[in-house]
Amino acid sequence: MESGRRHPREEIVATMRRIYHYRMTTTSGGNLSIRDPDGTIWITPARVDKGALEPADVVCLEAAGARRGRHAPSSEYPFHRAIYQARPDLGAVVHAHPGALVAFSICRRLPETRVQVLAHAICGKVVYAPYACPGSEQLGRNIAGAFGAGADCVMLENHGVVIGGKDLPDAFQRFETLEFVAQTLVKAATLGEVRVLPAERLVERELPAPGELPPVPPTGRETELREQICRFVHRAYEQRLLISTAGSLSARLDGEQFLITPRRRDRLELEPPGVVRATAAACERGKRPSRTARLHAAIYRNDPSAGAVINAQPAHTSAFAVTPAVLSTRTIPESYVVLREVGKLPHACVVAEAERIAAEVSLARRPVLLIENEGALVVGRDVLDAFDRLEVLEATAEALVLSQPLGPLVPMPSAAIDELRRVFGVP
């Protein structure tokens, strides 16, 4: 969601539909608001189906006190108002009851964002607000106090979560990222001790400013690749393999050039013109490639057979990345044939240590690699091949997590693995 593209009513409806569609709230739960520069607050209504919200349902509360709209505002308007009073820098608030964050809420635990560099950078300070009755002035004071102390994410005891942002896309992306971290941690809890990154590893490294590639008319192949990248990025988002803030996909174009997703742009709203043409050191004017651009460039340079590369942090796969657990592919034939053996690399920065990471993967030898506390790196012959590999990886990880309460894994025997290698030509 890009800020400023829609009227506040439409932006609130689009965001709530997205939250509801991905089961991050219920028909009756959660509320969103936007504050205009003049102090006007737009907020979701009380007692209206979140799954069927329309722009006309959104309530407008003017700074002078007038109310416009056909419904009463959300019963939790008091805490939205209190947050804005405590934090003049905030332009939007998201409140919802997503499953994993509610699990932390009812256990009175904070989701540990130090398991991933990007999540830690996006979510900022996460704190608790003491319980109070929903809709009460006391709850508003409790939440506003937490925001006033500098938090961007406030967990509510036995309730849910409240997230603030400079605008609604910013707040939503922070919310979605925190819920994905919580999902990862819940799944990781079944696998072993969660590994937290030390402070020196949590610094988000920046790429040097890239040079500019000369403008050239796109070829037919480039046009097709841009469209294909967008289709598979949207599909990966729908499959929850990527989220709005995390994950990158690239495809080799020609020579040293490749096309890659942009940095800090909502993955679900990516369109072909937003895809970035890049090399290891340059890109199209006025665009910012993903922070993984240097890594992808190194992989293409090292491996002429690689046609597409994906970095992703899907929840089940990430659970293996943040614990010592081994992601075994000797589960079913599809997993072994598509993924082969999945190695795990000690934590490495995809920006500063791109060359080190790139040396560990190749299409023929090791097309899938886990990077501790970073996620998955997948190489394919083309975009479809890489996407399929990522999808199978997450499905395999999910099956392994789901098997934990049932008993120890019974892997395919060596004879079966040898047969798969012979029949399917697995190196």
Predicted regions and their residues:
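Glycine-rich flexible loops
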Residues: M1-P427
